[in-house]
UniProtKB/Swiss-Prot annotation:
GO biological process, alphabetically ordered: ribosomal small subunit assembly; translation
Keyword entries, A-Z: Cytoplasm, Ribosome biogenesis
Name of the protein in question: Ribosome maturation factor RimP
Keyword Cell membrane: no
The organism of origin for this protein: Burkholderia cenocepacia (strain HI2424)
């Protein structure tokens, strides 16, 4: 079984989604997990303990294991991610330029079949729509919405 499959099976078996897996040259494994309710420290500890056991049993060599949430600027990789975060502000970088541009920032529309929509501000300030598929994307991320105003 491949490392990604092994980790994804373990993570999903615990009720979480594997968002991303990074393996550094120095033997560090970084695992990013999520679930609709968000991720707590206890969730990260639970997944870490289980993965340590599984990686030992499967004799997978690593120096350090780090499990965390994907953060406010979570990457969007699967069609289900684009469905879940429809209505959110995102940044999308395409593999090939479209109208001389590769990076777009706008409001994500729910996928229609394989086609994903992004409403963005066009050249003249008017609303424009970009339609693309997962195959067109180099990377896509949520744009964090943080409100620093105090609540009284």
């Amino acid at each position: 079984m491949q490392l990604t499959e092994l980790i994804e099976t373990t993570v999903t078996g615990l009720g979480y989604e594997l968002v991303e897996l990074e393996r550094t040259g120095r033997g560090m494994l970084c695992i990013y997990i999520d679930q609709p309710a968000g991720i707590s420290l206890e969730d990260c500890e639970k997944v870490t303990r289980q993965l340590q056991h599984v990686l030992t049993v499967e004799n997978i060599d690593y120096e350090r294991l780090e499990v965390s949430s994907p953060g406010l600027d979570r990457p969007l990789k699967k069609l289900a991610d684009f469905e879940r975060f429809a209505g959110s502000e995102v940044s999308v970088t395409l593999k090939k330029p479209l109208d001389g541009r590769k990076t777009y920032r706008g409001i994500l529309h729910a996928p229609n079949g394989e086609t994903i929509g992004l409403e963005f501000e066009g050249k003249k300030g008017e609303a424009a729509m970009l339609d693309f598929t997962l195959a067109d994307i180099d990377k896509a991320r949520l744009i964090p919405q943080v409100d620093f105003r105090s609540r009284k």
